Regions:
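Intracellular juxtamembrane helix-capping segments at the cytosolic ends
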Residues: 126-140, 327-340
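Central cavity-lining transmembrane alpha-helices of secondary-active solute carriers
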Residues: 63-78, 265-277
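Extracytoplasmic gate region of multi-pass secondary transporters
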Residues: 40-44, 223-276, 280, 363
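Helix-loop-helix hairpin linking two adjacent transmembrane segments in secondary transporters
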Residues: 151, 155-199
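Hydrophobic core of transmembrane alpha-helices in multi-pass small-molecule transporters
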Residues: 30, 100, 112-127, 233, ...
Length: 406
């Protein structure tokens, strides 16, 4: 009887800890990705108007930050997470992201602009998707897809709220103060929860963390690693390009600040449904097939930005693109965990996220350059459609994983 009671108590504590982990990762992604990553593009047109910067220059901050930070700190962050756990790295990441947004609110020179975008990239690497993915994968064996889907709802929830909050703050206090306020909110939302994360040694609920990790050399010589990496770069590059330019595109169509904010909010609201749906599908069907579906949804949405206008066109785009966006970021760590194991997930995703970060930073710059040259987005959007379809084709060569019962 004492043994039975001890087992029941252990299971109850494990469930409570799992709930805390899901809430913490939800709020971290809500703040660092939803608020910070999706909030910054809302201010691009203000920067362009006040400082006279081109669209290529404005989107180059994200590119420079991730290209400088990603290749070095992405690998180091993955190794540190696997070795010491995510907590300390996440605390540093939250503080750096808050500093970045506050700094960008008064960065009136390109030097300061790039400096604080480096802080932005450091915060994203240390406190964003990578440690959250590892936390979820370490604490969950069964229902990992659902847990990842719930945690990733934080991105959609934060991203849906931030344009509305930013628009309201900007109207009353100006864009400088509203961007600084978002930086303060990021710290207040995420830091307290991250502070109380238990050490990785307590994550005994997932038996996979006791298995020996696959050597990194074996991962780097595995063709599936490159298929997953290149395929994800295609999809992340496409959604990154569209996201960074969506408000600028809407302003070209003479949407007001409020109308543009509501469209962006609809994209992120739709991503909530996408994350739940794709997380549920990922626990039922082969995850490769779910990944292909997501990439095809993204490829289907972008043409709506090219066709002649008709009633509801932008709103239909926002819903379809949002569903694809919701599943895109979430499915990659699930596939990586299936292919290479949870113990090596930090290092594996550290490398893949670096590659994805390169794509996510260069594609918006490319799209901005296409617009600066041709004065429209037509050619750039056509290329993005082709890249999304190429990603679906590449992913189709991955093995089947993740089906219930296998």
């Amino acid at each position: 009887m004492p043994i039975l009671m001890e087992e029941l108590s252990s299971k109850s504590n494990s469930r409570s800890s799992q709930t805390y982990i899901v809430i913490t990762t939800f709020l971290s992604l809500f703040a660092l990705v939803g608020f910070a990553f999706y909030g910054l593009p809302f201010f691009f047109d203000f920067m362009a108007r006040e400082y006279g910067w081109s669209r290529t220059v404005i989107t180059s901050g994200n590119a420079l930050g991730k290209l400088l930070v990603g290749p070095l700190f992405g690998f180091i962050a993955g190794w540190l997470i696997d070795k010491y756990g995510p907590r300390r790295l996440m605390m540093a990441g939250v503080l750096m992201m808050g500093t970045a947004l506050i700094g960008l609110s008064f960065a009136d020179s390109l030097g300061l602009f790039y400096l604080f975008y480096i802080f932005n990239a450091l915060g994203y690497v240390c406190g964003g998707p990578l440690p959250c993915q590892v936390l979820i994968s370490r604490w969950f064996d069964k229902n990992r897809g659902k847990a990842m889907g719930i945690a990733y709802l934080g991105i959609g929830a934060g991203g849906a709220l931030v344009p509305l909050i930013a628009a309201g703050l900007e109207k009353n206090y100006g864009w400088h103060n509203s961007l600084a306020a978002l930086g303060v909110m990021v710290v207040l939302i995420a830091f307290p929860m991250v502070w109380f994360i238990k050490g990785s040694s307590s994550a005994r609920s997932n038996p996979e963390i006791r298995e020996p990790a696959i050597p990194i050399r074996s991962i780097l010589t595995n063709r599936n690693f490159y298929l997953l990496g290149i395929g994800s770069m295609c999809a992340i590059g496409v959604v990154g390009g569209v996201n960074q330019h969506l408000k600028l595109y809407l302003r070209d169509l003479d949407f007001t600040q409020s109308q543009a904010a509501h469209i962006i909010s609809l994209v992120l609201l739709s991503s909530l449904a996408g994350r739940l749906l794709m997380g549920w599908l990922a626990d039922i069907f082969h995850r490769k097939h779910v990944m292909i579906l997501i990439y095809l949804i993204v490829a289907t949405a972008v043409p709506l930005l090219l066709v002649n206008d008709f009633p509801g066109r932008i709103y239909i785009f926002a819903v379809i693109f949002g569903i694809g966006l919701g599943g895109d970021y979430m499915i990659i760590p699930l596939m990586a965990g299936d292919l290479f194991g949870v113990r090596a997930l930090g290092r594996t995703m550290g490398i893949i996220l670096v590659a994805d970060g390169v794509a996510e930073s260069l594609f918006p710059m490319f799209l901005g350059a296409m617009h600066d040259i041709h004065k429209n987005y037509t050619l750039g959007f056509v290329i993005l459609i082709c890249v999304a379809l190429a990603g679906a084709l590449i992913v189709s060569f991955l093995p089947k994983t993740g089906k219930a019962g296998n």
